[in-house]
């Protein structure tokens, strides 16, 4: 009883024959604990798989974002190829270890928080057990992204630093933290935090909203409660496309502020950074630099992420049911 599960017991009927009492019943507290754990595990795996798949494109995008060089698909290809020739194939994943250190807790927290915010908002608005209406659906995604960002932000800054510097400058993640703290102060670990949060709110809100809405519409029109994996990939790709397009200028601003210590610029505020970028490079070429690459990278990453999360959740729930039955 203490573990939240009632075990099946064998009793005797009045006529002396054996009778099996009710099957195991899992308490609400135990079910919620399992749900949170499953969400954390599924989210962690989803983030790791998605980010590793697009790491070379992500690194290339960051390098262009923090420089004044004009972006084009041709120049991006040249950069990737030149990096491969000079530093080797695995160098295309430079900084990915820092990415994993950040993205695994980030994705775990974000997906888990999203599930919990959906329940909380569903209870508050009276939609418990059914799909949320559009505004709570958007709010659940925005809150989930904000929660994860607040907790894991310094790891994102470290990833950006490692992506744009030669490997001789920083040997590992701990070295980045120590050197930044010593040379630039502890406050530098949260440089660019404000534009990051302001960008995450529309990005996470729109991404989760789009994905959940497409799944809801699919269920209504197809009669199937669960989409096929390729349909999940497509829904996730649309979610990534819309979410990243809406928040991209703030993504450029945060990268400039995060890497100011190694690029020679002194970006101090969001407005000041935007003004300097626009003055030097223009609106489209500056604030939307690398967006075309994000239209390739983003939908792929988000599609893989949402699909991996959903399928892992389904698998873990099936395994949990089997485990409960065997008890």
From Swiss-Prot:
Annotated localization: Mitochondrion inner membrane
Each Solcar repeat, start to end: 34-120, 132-217, 227-315
Pfam families per the UniProt record, alphabetical: Mito_carr
CC terms in the record's Gene Ontology section: mitochondrial inner membrane; mitochondrion
Protein keywords: Membrane, Mitochondrion, Mitochondrion inner membrane, Repeat, Transmembrane, Transmembrane helix, Transport
Keyword Lyase carried by entry: no
Disulphide-bonded residues: none
Family recorded in the similarity comment: Belongs to the mitochondrial carrier (TC 2.A.29) family.
PANTHER family the record matches: SOLUTE CARRIER FAMILY 25 (PTHR24089)
UniProt-recorded name of the protein: Mitochondrial coenzyme A transporter SLC25A42
Organism: Xenopus tropicalis
């Amino acid at each position: 009883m203490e573990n939240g599960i009632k075990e099946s017991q064998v009793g005797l009927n009045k006529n002396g024959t054996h009778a099996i009492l009710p099957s195991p019943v899992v308490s609400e507290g135990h079910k919620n604990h399992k749900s949170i754990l499953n969400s954390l595990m599924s989210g962690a795996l989803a983030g790791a798989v998605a980010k590793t798949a697009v790491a070379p494109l992500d690194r290339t995008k960051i390098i262009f974002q923090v420089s004044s060089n004009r972006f084009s698909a041709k120049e991006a290809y040249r950069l990737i190829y030149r990096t491969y020739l000079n530093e080797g194939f695995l160098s295309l994943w430079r900084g990915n270890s820092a990415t994993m250190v950040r993205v695994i807790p980030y994705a775990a927290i974000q997906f888990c928080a999203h599930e919990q915010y959906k329940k909380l908002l569903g209870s508050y608005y009276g939609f418990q057990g059914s799909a949320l209406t559009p505004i709570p659906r958007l709010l659940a995604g925005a809150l989930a992204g904000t929660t994860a960002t607040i907790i894991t932000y310094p790891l994102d800054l470290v990833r950006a630093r490692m992506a744009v510097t030669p490997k001789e400058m920083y040997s590992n993640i701990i070295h980045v933290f120590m050197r930044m703290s010593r040379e630039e102060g502890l406050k530098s670990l949260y440089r660019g935090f404000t534009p990051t949060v302001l960008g995450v709110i529309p990005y996470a809100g729109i991404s989760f909203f789009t994905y959940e809405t497409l799944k809801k519409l699919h269920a209504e029109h197809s009669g199937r409660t669960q989409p096929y994996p390729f349909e999940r990939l497509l829904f996730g790709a649309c979610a990534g496309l819309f979410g990243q397009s809406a928040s991209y200028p703030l993504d450029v601003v945060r990268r400039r502020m995060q890497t100011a210590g190694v690029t020679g610029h002194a970006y101090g505020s969001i407005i000041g950074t935007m003004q300097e970028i626009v003055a030097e490079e223009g609106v489209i070429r500056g604030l939307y630099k690398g967006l075309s690459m994000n239209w390739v990278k983003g939908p792929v990453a988000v599609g893989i992420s949402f699909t991996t999360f959903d399928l892992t959740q389904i698998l873990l729930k099936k395994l949990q049911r089997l485990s409960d039955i065997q008890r």
